[in-house]
Swiss-Prot record:
Family assignment from sequence similarity: Belongs to the periplasmic pilus chaperone family.
Chain's gene name: sfmC
Protein name: Probable fimbrial chaperone SfmC
Described purpose of this protein according to its UniProt entry: Part of the sfmACDHF fimbrial operon. Could contribute to adhesion to various surfaces in specific environmental niches. Increases adhesion to eukaryotic T24 bladder epithelial cells in the absence of fim genes.
Signal sequence range: 1-23
InterPro entries tied to this protein: Ig-like_fold, PapD-like_sf, Periplasmic_pilus_chap, Pili_assmbl_chap_C_dom_sf, Pili_assmbl_chaperone_bac, Pili_assmbl_chaperone_C, Pili_assmbl_chaperone_CS, Pili_assmbl_chaperone_N
The organism's place on the tree of life at top rank: Bacteria
Amino acid sequence: MMTKIKLLMLIIFYLIISASAHAAGGIALGATRIIYPADAKQTAVWIRNSHTNERFLVNSWIENSSGVKEKSFIITPPLFVSEPKSENTLRIIYTGPPLAADRESLFWMNVKTIPSVDKNALNGRNVLQLAILSRMKLFLRPIQLQELPAEAPDTLKFSRSGNYINVHNPSPFYVTLVNLQVGSQKLGNAMAAPRVNSQIPLPSGVQGKLKFQTVNDYGSVTPVREVNLN
């Protein structure tokens, strides 16, 4: 029982210290999503450590849309130590075969940060370390697309089928839907894949117009759109 109490106190203490540290600074990524033009040799995203005295071990990798680690990408450096008040650049290089030329391909970039521990200050005590995993969408975009990504949300077609909202996305771009709401019922965020039909679960009995927003290439939320569900 005492061991559990000590562990709980240790967790609470760590969270308080961690919250204080993050108030003074933190680890930040230079984007919330990455657009990788298919003809580019590489793309990059910066990572900044604004802490004044804390170092972090940073580990990065890319997964496919199924959550499996993707070997067709190289990230340099894949593992490094982020020093206090420093900025580093993660370079992303696609080395795989050509992908679909008529639509975007989706991947996920993962960045895990682990705070360093001063072993000399521990004096044999146990310390709970909390790693933070940040995930962002990576879109590999074909260069020959004629459509504009900013126009993709306006091409979406919505209809209702029982307890589902059918979403048809005729564009070649992934469209991230946020702040979805039917009537007064709020729904979870969703993503409409390019050139396919998808469905969004809808609680039974919900009536009203569909309101939603989207996220553009820069990670900004667009104005509210409103459509009727036929």
